[in-house]
Amino acid sequence: LTTRYVLLAAAEADLREIIRYTRQQWGNAQTRSYMLKLQDGIESLATGQGFFKDMSAFHPGLRMARCEHHYIFCIPRNDMPALMVAILHKQMDLMTRLESRPK
């Protein structure tokens, strides 16, 4: 099985916070369901499937896709796993948050 993506530390922290918040607000079953949807969204973006927006004007190669209530940001790489840069809630100031992320 080939790894299609890797989570940068900041994206991993985003995912942990999403899990914590979802579990606290809606319980374990909803958390599992939401995480499966996010995982599918991450996989799709990593492989260039589905709908995504080219954000190269912000950073070379950067892609963004909406998944449920979040936006996933990814930098695909040739012959290497895609880098997942951030997973941010739709109500956040996305560009401000991204500016503080490693590039």
Language-model segments: which ranges?
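Arg/Lys-rich, positively charged N-terminal/basic patches that mediate binding to nucleic acids
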Residues: 1-35
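Hydrophobic pocket/interface hotspot
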Residues: 11, 38, 84
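Generic alpha-helical structural context detector
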Residues: 20, 40-43, 86
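Basic/aromatic recognition patch in beta-strand/loop cores that engages polyanionic ligands
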Residues: 39-40, 50-82
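Short proline/glycine- and basic residue-enriched helix-capping loop/turn segments at helix->loop/beta transitions
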Residues: 46-47
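Enriched for short, Lys/Arg-rich terminal
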Residues: 75-103
